[in-house]
Amino acid sequence: MEDAGLLLIRIMIGVVFLFYGTQKLFGWFGGYGIKGTGQWFESIGVKPGNVAAALSGLGELVSGILFILGVFLPLGAAIITIIMLGAIVKVHGAKGFANGAGGFEYNLVLIAVSIGVALIGSGAYALHF
């Protein structure tokens, strides 16, 4: 049963990061693509915005794929942690803890779950090399 639980968690984390990565990179699912996301990054002081948008979008896309496949989880968790810490520092930290107020609660959950899964391992239902 633990393997099924790990698979469920991995898929959910993967889908979340695939979603946000494709928003930033391609403008899918109501996203703004690299240009629009880059402009937003510039507006919060992250420059060059287009580079930040491309790197964060690519990091989200790659980490999402790694988690879904269950491979290189420490790398995927490190990417997620870096991106989420950036989001806390630049966007959510000043708004406090509560997610409902735009705070960093959700970011911390994503960090903790991704690191936790990386420490436990992918389980039986994953690609194994």
Curated annotation (Swiss-Prot):
It is found in: Cell membrane. Its EC number is 1.-.-.-. Keywords: Aromatic hydrocarbons catabolism, Cell membrane, Detoxification, Membrane, Oxidoreductase, Transmembrane, Transmembrane helix. Induction: Repressed by MhqR. Strongly induced by stress due to exposure to 2-methylhydroquinone (2-MHQ) and less strongly induced after diamide or catechol stress. Not induced by oxidative stress due to hydrogen peroxide or methylglyoxal. Coiled coil: none annotated. One of its GO terms (cellular component) is plasma membrane. One of its GO terms (biological process) is catabolic process. The chain crosses the membrane at residues 11-31, 65-85, 109-129. Pfam families: DoxX. It is a multi-pass membrane protein. One of its GO terms (molecular function) is oxidoreductase activity. Belongs to the DoxX family. Putative oxidoreductase that may contribute to the degradation of aromatic compounds. This is Putative oxidoreductase MhqP. It comes from Bacillus subtilis (strain 168). The gene is mhqP.
